[in-house]
Amino acid sequence: MADNISTGILSGLYEKVYNPDVLSCLANLSNDEVFTPPEIVNKMLDMLPQELFSSPDTKFLDPAVKTGVYLREIAKRLIKGLEAVIPDRQQRIDHIFKNQLYGIAITELTSLLSRRSLYCSKYANSAFSVTHFENSDGNIRFKRIHHSFDKSGRCIFCGASETQYDRGEEREYYAYEWIHTLHPEEIFGMKFDVIISNPPYQLSDEGNGASAKPIYQYFVETAKNLKPRFLTMIIPARWYAGGKGLDEFRKTMLEDKRIVRIVDYVNAKDCFSSINLGGGICYFLWDRDNPNKCQYTNIHDSVVSTETRTLNEFPVFVRYNEAISIIHKVISQKERTVSEVVGSRNPFGLSSFERGTKEPQEIKLFSSGGTGYIPVDDIPQLSLIHISEPTRPEPISY
């Protein structure tokens, strides 16, 4: 009976019954190079004005191509969106792939993988490519870049250690072209309407996890400097707290009114099920021409909360939308806050090792070692202490 079923029917049945997306099945190489699930890619694309996909002039760039999933999903939307503009399907595909989609691969391996995803061939000039280029790269380039080390042994662009990344030609340098040039605009020599990516997150500094050096901020900053109409990237959410070289990045991001959308996953596994990334993950939309308050969505423990907020409203970034109304209520009471009477470290100029003496003095000192005494003259920052009676100063807690 099976012999009587045509190959076409079997093929059609297979497509309907089982048609997995291979890019959703790939394992991540490491926490440095995280592959983006197609579902997340499309959520990011949904944030963009959809008319971008109906214009034959919109140019898209992924400056950190891994699997090619961003360019592939954009191509799908353009092929559908330009149907009325360029009716002939092959002409439409040729135009889109040659004039609208561009990428910079992060390694030689990912350049081959991404061309296979987009062009159906790892070489864009092969007979198997869905559109023919004169060169093997097509519009997905990979250029082997060396780090530029200074006298201290650190790369001037990304801070990589010379002892760890000054390697032989047989190994990857992880010197990504997008952030290892003074003139990224010259890579393709054109302006882009949309820059979209999931950049490498960190470089190992002979530690791992939280101790590794973050580099994703350099991809964001470089993209901003090129002033595309829209920028969207998915990055670790650790920048909310700063530290590890992220303080200035945190400040500029929270102050940037062009960050009009953030989707925040407190647990990174809700977004990338196969990685362990402390601090969560987020993706954002930067809109060059329409600065506004940010529509911020927080996702934790299956709870989804969205509020339109000013990101730098408080000195500390408040991650949970549910806390905003509580903070406003507390502030409205105009009462003295704990921060006015509690110091994080050495608030009176006293060392944390100070225990005082057992002999009674003017000031009582409470510490982890018990109760001691200290003369008034031995307190460097006496002005911080409220003395109600000159002869009997109030005791202080330390």
Task: Give the label of every model feature segment.
Residues 368-383:
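Sequence-specific dsDNA recognition surfaces
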Residues 138-139, 301-302, 371:
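Intrinsic-disorder/low-complexity loop/linker signature
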Residues 275-354:
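Flexible, glycine-/basic-rich loop-and-beta segments that form/coincide
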Residues 357:
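ER/Golgi luminal nucleotide-sugar-dependent glycosyltransferases, focusing on the catalytic module
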Residues 2-262, 267-271, 280, 284, ...:
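SAM-dependent methyltransferase catalytic region
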